[in-house]
Amino acid sequence: MKHLIRRLSRVADSSSEFSIRRSTSSFRNRRGHHRLHAPPPPWSICPARRVNTVPAGHVPVYVGEEMERFVVSAELMNHPIFVGLLNRSAQEYGYAQKGVLHIPCHVIVFERVVETLRLGGFEGSGDLENLVASLLSGDELIPETTE
């Protein structure tokens, strides 16, 4: 596991595809005053279509068969649920995968897991506990969307 995390750090730092920017950047508003962007929250996740660079403290990952790119907070890597996803990735792709980390999980499931972590965890949410248990066992369920 340490080997995989070290490898992720090197990929995020050295990849020519991604440039790391400072977590607080300034810009001028209409009146010419500088404003600072707040750094992203620790449990943040950003779809790639909105993010061209990888902020400091974040790691790019590809999720699902669609290989949709997300930028995930490095703090998330220590959570037991995400460690399970990393273990599943290592089983499926091995530790020698090159480039960005691939997470073998449906995009909708990944988004729900990260959103639940951001909102405070899995305590008391039976549906998500079942979803994560099935995710880590390899029997992936795709939740219904209410769009």
UniProtKB/Swiss-Prot annotation:
Keywords: Auxin signaling pathway, Cytoplasm, Developmental protein, Growth regulation
Gene Ontology cellular component terms for the protein in this record: cytoplasm
Induction field: By auxin.
Tissue spec. comment: Specifically expressed in the quiescent center and cortex or endodermis initials of root stem niches. Expressed in vascular tissues from hypocotyls, petioles and cotyledons.
GO BP, one annotated term: auxin-activated signaling pathway
Subcellular location per the Swiss-Prot or TrEMBL entry: Cytoplasm
Pfam families, sorted: Auxin_inducible
Note: Plants over-expressing SAUR41 display pleiotropic auxin-related phenotypes. These phenotypes include elongated hypocotyls, increased length of primary roots, increased numbers of lateral roots, increased vegetative biomass, twisted inflorescence stems, overexpanded petals, reduced seed setting and increased basipetal auxin transport in hypocotyls.
Assigned protein family: Belongs to the ARG7 family.
Primary role: Plays a role in the regulation of cell expansion, root meristem patterning and auxin transport.
Name of the protein in question: Auxin-responsive protein SAUR41
Encoding gene, per UniProt annotation: SAUR41
